């Protein structure tokens, strides 16, 4: 599994939208190239903190970025809005969806901190990270999670952030440009495979890169 981290308003969700769009197209969006096998083309996107209205906006933007019509179901993208549930209920719903949705290749968890009550609890953090590793192994899928950075430093927030850094294959850092807040920079904070060149993006009037 992998993760994106960044401060509030750094456009982490937008960056992940590009990853999902690349997976839906099975080609390249921004600098992300995806190649999912034919029997694992489905993407499951889980949002734990936004309203259904905001989730719909994110879904439409992903479809537009993938060059797909945004007014009908693509068949390859499944969205779960879990804001109203408790952390245990969220884990249970996500587990059910991962094990009972056929053809899934990529799972996004936008808001992994909402799968625990206390981000500084070693027990809870170890449990959810172990779940991520179990799900990826059992279902042979890739999971990408999103987590905020601490306000005061570059670290991912809480004990769950420490666990993510220790266990993730890749941790992407999304940062606002210091001189122009319309621009965000993406770099690999930690990567076990081949490194990639940092890049930047800005969003146009149609909310596209």
Regions found by a protein language model. Give the residues of each.
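Secondary-structure boundary/capping motif
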Residues: 12, 54-55, 117, 153-156
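Phosphate-binding/switch region of NTP-binding enzymes
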Residues: 3-4, 9, 123-208
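Short histidine/acidic/glycine/proline-rich micro-motifs that form metal-
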Residues: 10, 50, 84-85, 150-152
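Short, flexible, glycine/charge-rich loop motifs used to bind or transfer phosphoryl groups or to couple energy/partner
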Residues: 30-36, 67, 95-98, 134, ...
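Conserved inter-motif catalytic segment of the P-loop NTP-binding fold
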Residues: 37-123, 127
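Conserved RecA-like P-loop NTPase ATPase core
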Residues: 20, 45, 110, 168, ...
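Walker A/P-loop NTP-binding active-site region of P-loop NTPases
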Residues: 1-68, 171
């Amino acid at each position: 599994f992998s993760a994106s981290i960044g401060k509030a308003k750094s456009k982490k969700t937008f960056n992940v939208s590009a990853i999902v769009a690349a997976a839906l197209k099975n080609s390249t969006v921004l600098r992300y190239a995806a190649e999912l096998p034919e029997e694992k083309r489905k993407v499951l996107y889980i949002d734990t903190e936004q309203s259904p209205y905001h989730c719909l906006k994110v879904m439409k933007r992903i479809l537009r970025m993938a060059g797909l019509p945004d007014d009908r179901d693509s068949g390859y993208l499944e969205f779960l809005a879990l804001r109203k549930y408790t952390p245990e209920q969220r884990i249970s719903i996500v587990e059910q969806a991962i094990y009972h949705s056929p053809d899934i290749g990529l799972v996004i968890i936008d808001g992994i901190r909402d799968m625990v009550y206390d981000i500084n609890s070693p027990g809870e953090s170890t449990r959810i990270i172990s779940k991520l590793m179990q799900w990826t192994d059992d279902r042979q899928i890739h999971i990408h999670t999103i987590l905020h950075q601490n306000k005061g430093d570059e670290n991912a927030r809480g004990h769950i952030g420490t666990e993510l850094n220790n266990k993730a294959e890749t941790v992407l850092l999304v940062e606002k440009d210091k001189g122009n807040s319309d621009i965000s920079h993406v770099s690999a904070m930690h990567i076990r495979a081949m490194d990639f060149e940092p890049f930047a993006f800005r969003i146009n009037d149609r909310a596209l890169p």
